[in-house]
Amino acid sequence: MKVNLGVNIFKAGLCEEVNQLVIFRFVGFYISDNNEFIVVFPKGYKLPDSEVQLSEDIANLINTLSRYQKESNFDPENTQIFGDAGNYTSLSAAHWLIKDFITNGIFINNKISYVRNQNNNIDWPKTIKYMNPVISNKQVAYLEFVSRKKRTDESNLLTRVHGYIVYQSFKILGPFIGLKIPPELIEYTNQLLQEYDINQIIHFIEQERNNFFTDREVHLCNKLIEFLKGNSSVEANSNIMCLAVRHFHVVWEKICSFLFANMSANNIMPNPFWQVNDKSIKTSQIPDVMLRNKNQLYIIDAKYYTLYKNLKGLPGWGDLVKQFFYLYTLKDRVDNIREMFNIFVFPGTSNEIIKYYGKSAVEGVESLGYIYGFTLDVSKALKMYAHYNSNQMKKNLVEVVQRSI
């Protein structure tokens, strides 16, 4: 297995071999120096029978990590970059470039030239500056004009760079997201990097970017640079790229917050503190997600746990006490609340997007109430988060909770 994966992924501590099994310590994508494409899905995800669905799930995972990367700037401790052997930006940029190509096609640089005596697109400032007018009856008239003519520069280097990188992007990701290489990209398969150094190309794109003003053109240049920079550190005999996080629980919290949160706990939750002599040090207690529905309050904790059939590994004393305390301290701090519910949300796979799992309580202390556990379908959650579509999930959660308890 180490031969297939290469040694870098083991050196980075992203996977280890235990009893002849390889255990991955990240979620995301990894392309090794042996061109092995590894996809590691989050906990709770089960491979679908449909290859079409699998391709869609892979695309949604890419979009999810790309969104998290953009919004959270990938905390260095949570980012997987294989030192000098690759960069996570390449896969993210490759996926963006594929989507942009499908929408807009290959970039064509249109150059403006100026010609005489064409009545279309007259450039009046240049006509006045360079053409001699005819004056008749105190009226000024121009018999010759300077006109603007737009021509397509298909040999432009930026067009070639774009075509080459999009071709490489399809070659890398296409098979895994259900896309074949479009035939119009075949002409860009020539080894552009044999003619130019990567740093030269990056410098050229940066210069070209200064001449563009539309958002699409500027963003396109940025993504081309991201892709190339992601490969510029790759060793000569290596082709490692990755888009991955070591600790997916932070992404799971973001997903649950996006889907369910509609209020903030800031300035509501009281802060525990230490008093030592004349100094006081505060710590914070903030629930992951808070959802208000009329006179109901749902205190939600995103739990990135694997749910086993033998019930091992469920949230223990510390997690339970913290959640009970959240409800206890919020009882009199939110106005016009009649009912409060403690909720754990676990990743899972189910035909139902939200499914009741079970409940927890403290034996003999009924006054604390229950913590209700629900599974959230990973595939559907990734899709909604990736496409910025919460899809009435707040309403769905409220309905499922009320139906289940």
Q: What feature does the model see in each segment?
A:
Residues M1-I205, F213-N237, E399-I405:
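Terminal, charged accessory segments of proteins
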